[in-house]
Amino acid sequence: MSASATRSRNKQSKLRDDERLDISKDEFNRIQEAFGQEEFRKLFFDYVEEIQDPENRKIYEEEITQLEKERGVEVRFIHPKPGFVIKTALDGELKCFINIAGSEEIERPKNEVATDPSSGNRGLSWSIPMAQTSSRDDCDAKNNHCKVFDVVFHPDALHLAKRNKQFRQCLIDTALDAVEREYKVSLDRANLKFPKLDYKGIPRPTVIRKLADNPTAEEQEPHPLAHMFPTQPPAPGKPEPRVLPLKTKPTPVPEFTVPRYSIKHSHDVDLSEYTDELDAKLHVTVPRALVVEIELPLLRSTAECQLDVTSKSVYLFSERQGAKYRLKLDLPFTVDDKAGQARFDTDLRRLSITLPVVRKSSKEQAQMHETLRHFSREDSGVELHSNSESPVEEDPDGELSDSKADISDISSPTAAPVRHSNSPFLKSSVHYQLPSKFDCNVLDNVMAFVLHVPNVQPDSIEQLREQRSLHLQFATIGSGYYPTHYAFYVELPAEHEDSAIESVEAEAWDNNVVLKLCLTSQSETPASYLAGLDATELKEYPVHGQYNVKSKEKVIARKENAPFEIKFEHNQEGQALKVSIRPGTKEEEKENQDQEPEIDQQHQQQVQNKKPGKKQRKRNKKERSLSESACADMILQEPLTKNSELQPKSTFNLPQRKQRSYSECNDSTGGSHRGILKRFSRYGPRPSMSDSCSSIDDCSSYSCSVDASGTSLFSHSFGGIPEEDRSDAGLSESCKKTVRFNDHIMKQVFRLDSSILGQRKKNQKRRDLKLRAQHRRLSEGDSVDYEESRGSALKQQENQSRNCNKPKGVSVLHDSGLDLTGAPGAHSNNNESEAKNAMMFEMDD
């Protein structure tokens, strides 16, 4: 039996002073020893016979009546006479019997003519007196525990019940209502049975007490100590009997009864649930099995009922006369209906159904584990992507594109839902916090806020935008899986009345939240702003930095687009070429263009007339014919800069990892490409010394340097050098070129137990992680300040060093055979323009 049923029976027993015997162990031992004596047993049996003797019982009642009469109380003993018995269930779990008995001490039923107020029909209104005895425990035919109640009427009422079915039903309803009202229990009215019994158990008399109408003279004498007690209120007149009103509407009797049931969650002891792992307590709230217990006190076996079990419900149905049950129960978990078990306890009349719960599949559990790991992980500043690996060594052009694609995916703005201002934005039942640290930067008409709150859920970001203010709320999940709610309200200062918010973007990162407020074009750049938890708690904060990129871009574009003046000077004795580069005016450009054709013709005639000597040929083998080809590239770049002045452009200082460098034999016309150390065509025109030194010849090729950065035109790789064939004796030795190698040796060590491709992917993954960590540390709001301060500092340092160590005119640089494009000065466009103003290549031994 369930605990609730036991508590209800105990409560009912206490109300009727029918508690179980409570004795100590010492008293129990003494009684046990006494019953072991034959003399005591004989005396005890004599006492029982004396009590059960009707004559002695009559004498006992007369003595009790006389004693109560002396106290001014009239006592009447009611001896119930058998009538008929009602069998039903008590609270849906215990069998009970109600004895409908009769006694002459009860008043006769009375009736009077009355009209039904609902229908207007005339009829008889009955008043049926009754008496109730205390409940008692008994046993049924199978020696099972049951409860017995007695309801006593006048014998005339029982006689009318036998003759009239309607009066009999009225008598039964009155008895059931009296038991439910007196003992606070629920009876099963749908399964009433009428066994062939006149009375259940042994009849026990009950007592009715009331004050005497004619007290004696002794009773009227005042008590000698009455003056010590407070004055008693005057006694009321003749007490009226308690009248229990009948129900105006009959209690609806259902066709089937819903049995009493309970659902228990069964768990097994699993030691893995007591560990500190993240997935240790995932299934703590999910039981191993469900145990459904259904109380069927009126059924003898399960053959009399039907039971259907599905994955989500249990259905019980019984049509047996006197035991009509119907139950449809929805289960809280999905169960395996084919692996369930059912057992019926005939002693307790209880049906127990055990159903194993279906756990989630391994795939769903793995997905849940990944979700929990994502919520509870600590931010390390590095984000891993399985799809970010790319073989850089094999495809150098794909590295930068892949990294840019990853960055664009990460920094995609979060689509935050926008609420209307009519509905309350912040929930009253949720406690919101203001971010402890935040800063603001202004870039033109964009205000960038950085809210330093880690692990923000992108789906939780909500915003309420107005003309001059914005309200933002979001939530985070900590290591304890408990959400923390934040709110941020920002408003433009009142000084700038024309300022208004045009659009809003909110981005959730691992360590912070970036909020962008795009102001209208008529808005002025604010120097401060108001921020707080809501509109009632605002505080003024200054803006960290203000930047105007558009004005700076115009100045930089003017400097970059300025024309350059390039001069070439040949020294035949030292075989040196002197290049001077400086900004020139438009007049100087026109003069140079007129003089260039004349100088080129004179120079070509001098070279063709003069033949090189043997020493000179040997010296030419060690020299580089680089300077004029590089200068020719610069000359070709001038018309491009002129065309770019006509078109507005916006440049951004982004770090570049690649550049295109030109070899010695670079062809500006995009002709056929020749490989390194290849002889010239036997039937084609052979280049002269002047062509190889002053122009870009046919055999041209391009090479790409991954390590170089910047856009300088002076980073070249030397390739496409022709090799003379032994059979071709007529080829001039002056066209031969040499290659110088760097002294630095690149070395790569591989482990014996790993493959080259495996280490290549590992190194590429490490480089990608460093690149992402660098981009993540510099958020969009702080990166602008960092780039501007860094660029200005580098510019000042280089100007100071250049003014102190180098002349303003021309500087001499020796070609060492090394690529200098990776130098720090090559990262800035300003440094490149100044490097062009002072440059010279000298060829010597």
Curated annotation (Swiss-Prot):
Biased composition (Polar residues): 640-671, 794-804
Keyword match Cytoplasm: yes
Ranges annotated as biased composition (Acidic residues): 391-400
Modified residues (Phosphoserine): S380, S779
Location in the cell: Cytoplasm
Start and end residues of each stretch annotated as Disordered: 362-420, 575-691, 773-845
Annotated PANTHER family: PIH1 DOMAIN-CONTAINING PROTEIN 1 (PTHR22997), PROTEIN KINTOUN (PTHR22997:SF3)
Purpose: Required for cytoplasmic pre-assembly of axonemal dyneins, thereby playing a central role in motility in cilia and flagella. Involved in pre-assembly of dynein arm complexes in the cytoplasm before intraflagellar transport loads them for the ciliary compartment.
Protein name: Protein kintoun
Organism this protein belongs to: Drosophila erecta (Fruit fly)
Gene that this polypeptide is encoded by: Nop17l
